[in-house]
């Protein structure tokens, strides 16, 4: 595991939301991060589809970590805008 991947994985594991939705960090490369989440009842809306808030939160998380992967060590990203 690279230092970059270790830094991002450590941050990922500290996020309670990601544990709650059962998200996993699949891959980390400079400028690209892949996150998977199983579809389950806990992330559904009233029609049985995955709630859009969960989708946008996972997208924001992946984009934030992809940006963080390009920054110097010790730099953090709060959100992707």
Predicted feature locations:
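Terminal targeting signals and extreme-terminal segments of soluble enzymes
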Residues: 1-81
């Amino acid at each position: 595991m690279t230092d970059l991947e270790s830094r991002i994985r450590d941050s990922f594991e500290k996020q309670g939301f990601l544990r709650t939705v059962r998200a996993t960090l699949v891959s980390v490369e400079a400028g690209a991060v892949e996150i998977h989440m199983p579809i389950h009842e806990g992330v559904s809306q009233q029609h049985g589809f995955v709630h859009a808030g969960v989708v946008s939160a996972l997208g924001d998380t992946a984009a934030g970590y992809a940006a963080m992967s390009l920054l110097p060590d010790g730099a953090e990203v709060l959100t992707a805008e």
